[in-house]
Amino acid sequence: EIADTLEYIIAYPYWHVPNRIAVEEVLVKAKKDSTYLERNNFDILNSKREILDPKSIDWSKMTTNNFKYSVRQEGGSANSLGYVKFIFPNKYSIYLHDTPTKYYFSYESRAYSHGCVRVQHALDLADFLLENDENRYTLDSIKSFIDRRKERVISLNHKIPIYIYYMPTVADSLGNIIFYEDVYGLDNKLIQRLVSYGKQ
């Protein structure tokens, strides 16, 4: 459960790859394919946030334990966050974002994200938020930043409450119980806690 406020929009965002994804996915693919990083517009950064030449790294010696670099994906059409993301600062580093993989929205089950929330019509959402925010920036502004390939943070004048709940079981307006797929596997944990509590 997250209850927070949507505070700003980032146009043409970088994707700062979480460490777990960097070592479990990007590192594995980079070791297998020397062109992977360049083809997918990934930068490797040191602790000073300086971009390194991937060829200067001995990838054969890199492991999940000694990979001490940061990974960042350049903005653009292939960026995993698409052209825009929506930030509501929270301890889980979860946000809403555009996506280049629009075909996922045609699937009945769409839980393919690493944890953040993909938005099907992200530019439309940005347009709606800015228009109702009476913001000096507009959808045309965002498109201009995209065309110029420039990351830009756009603060909202009016912060918007946002609530995210995970409820694989709900009741409809008629009182019927509806069960959805427990994509995060939390039902079993809850059942185990209830059983343990009942034995006390």
Region locations from a protein language model:
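Well-ordered beta-sheet/strand-loop patches within structured domains
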Residues: 1-200
